[in-house]
UniProtKB/Swiss-Prot annotation:
SUPFAM superfamilies: Ribulose-phoshate binding barrel. The gene is pyrF. This is Orotidine 5'-phosphate decarboxylase. Catalyzes the decarboxylation of orotidine 5'-monophosphate (OMP) to uridine 5'-monophosphate (UMP). It comes from Lactobacillus johnsonii (strain CNCM I-12250 / La1 / NCC 533). Its EC number is 4.1.1.23. PROSITE patterns: OMPDECASE.
Length: 235
């Protein structure tokens, strides 16, 4: 089974979405990430429509609230036909457990329960921000390890983390966990707003379960060719 390459759709409306999606290939061959911008503009209906068309969907809303609110939010998201969704690991173990319970409760009987991924530290967070703004005295690796360990114990299926941290996490948190990594840039591409980045080949070698790639695919002259090239490099 090939490892997923997930296309980050950093778009804000359905018109732009409909212009891009046909350029990526057949729906059954495409795994997409929908974030806050598109979801908040177009609403849950767009997610359900895309799921019904055959797209695999990572709905990345990074829920972070009191457990009861997150439970009900996750329960609603589970009805949309998504494959992955996210919470912030910093929300704590009770919130993570509530999200997992909500996904189970909301999933239709004939569907698979979406995988719950906990966001550790965003790939835009540098060591300076971690130490001087978040007032965290741990190293980045130790902070991510702590958050990942908490998330696994609370019932999360995996974490969102930098590819730079995957090898260490696999050794210390375990192989029976998903390690989904943004911050992927093919060689020669600009880092944009990411601080901790790697190439698809490096992510493969370090053990990422799946990678998330946005602009190097969506802004390419031939998005489908760029997508297929990254899939090949990662698998």
């Amino acid at each position: 089974m090939s490892r997923p390459v997930i296309v980050a759709l950093d778009l804000d409306n359905e018109k732009k979405l409909n212009e891009l999606l046909p350029k990526l290939g057949k729906p059954e061959n495409v795994f997409i990430k929908i974030g806050m911008e598109l979801f908040f503009n177009e609403g849950p209906k767009i997610v359900k429509q895309l799921s019904e068309q055959g797209y695999q969907i990572f709905l990345d809303l990074k829920m972070n609230d009191i457990p009861n609110t997150v439970y009900n939010g996750a329960k609603a998201l589970a009805r949309l036909g998504i494959t992955y969704t996210t919470v912030h690991a910093l929300g704590g173990s009770q919130m993570i457990k509530a999200a997992k319970d909500g996904l189970i409760a909301g999933t239709p009987i004939d569907k698979n329960v979406p995988k719950l991924l906990a966001v550790t530290e965003l790939t835009s967070i540098s060591d300076e921000i971690l130490h001087y703004e978040q007032n965290c005295n741990l190293s980045m690796n130790d902070q991510v390890l702590s958050l990942a360990t908490t998330a696994k114990k609370a019932g999360a299926d995996g974490v969102i983390c930098s590819p730079l941290e995957v090898k260490d996490l696999r050794q210390k948190v375990g192989e029976d966990f998903l390690y989904v990594t943004p911050g992927i840039r093919p060689a020669g591409n600009a880092k944009d707003d990411q601080s901790r980045v790697a190439t698809p080949l490096q992510a493969k070698e370090w053990g990422s379960t799946a990678i998330v790639v946005g602009r190097p695919i969506t802004l390419a002259t031939d998005p489908e060719a760029a997508y297929e090239a990254i899939k090949k490099e990662f698998n």
